[in-house]
Amino acid sequence: MPLKMAVYPGSFDPVTYGHLDIIDRGLKIFDGVIVAVARNSEKNALFSVQERIELLTEILKDRPEARVETFDGLLVDYVRRVGASVIIRGLRAVSDFEFEFQLAQMNRNITRDVETLFMMTSVPYSYLSSSIVKEVSCLNGPVDKLVPPLVKSALDAKFRG
């Protein structure tokens, strides 16, 4: 029986505990999860694509069923190319749903071979976003409960040299 793979795409700028929650829950459903760092979301990025890949790879090193890759272009093309059939998307609030629903419908319009699975974030992460993390860290606020220690160190290096 072939492995059932899913793709969890995002900018991950930076990766948060909310992202890791979705990855871990995805790994309970699928044989493997490809964490796909989007190359075409560079505008206003704090971390380069390479830095994000390195952070994610180190953080996920104890999760062999998760692998980190990068992609550009249409997500559904990438998903088909890597042999996956499901896109995982995390939803924090109802406000996320409308945009994500539109993307899922467009992807479905492009191909019927790829499904989108929406996962509600766990309650502790329902407000969490990479943008909030960057804002709080930039202002020297505490982000210890929002991101792994490696990411906190990387944020400190960016904002405080």
Curated annotation (Swiss-Prot):
Keyword rRNA-binding attributed: no
**Pathway assignment:** Cofactor biosynthesis; coenzyme A biosynthesis; CoA from (R)-pantothenate: step 4/5
InterPro entries (alphabetical): Cyt_trans-like, PPAT, Rossmann-like_a/b/a_fold
Q: Which cofactors, by name?
A: Mg(2+)
* Protein family according to the UniProt entry: Belongs to the bacterial CoaD family.
**Gene Ontology BP, a term:** coenzyme A biosynthetic process
Species of provenance: Geobacter sp. (strain M21)
Q: Could you give the subunit structure recorded for this chain?
A: Homohexamer.
Residues recorded as binding ATP, renumbered to this chain, are S11, F12, H19, G90, L91, R92, E100, Y125, S126, Y127, L128, S129, S130, S131
Name where it's found: Cytoplasm
Q: What does this protein do?
A: Reversibly transfers an adenylyl group from ATP to 4'-phosphopantetheine, yielding dephospho-CoA (dPCoA) and pyrophosphate.
Question: Which reaction(s) does its UniProt entry say it catalyses?
Answer: (R)-4'-phosphopantetheine + ATP + H(+) = 3'-dephospho-CoA + diphosphate
The site annotation (Transition state stabilizer) covers: H19
Q: What is its EC number?
A: 2.7.7.3
The UniProt entry, under Pfam families, shows: CTP_transf_like
Which residues does the record give as substrate binding sites? S11, K43, L75, R89
Its recorded name reads Phosphopantetheine adenylyltransferase
Q: Which UniProt keywords apply?
A: ATP-binding, Coenzyme A biosynthesis, Cytoplasm, Magnesium, Nucleotide-binding, Nucleotidyltransferase, Transferase
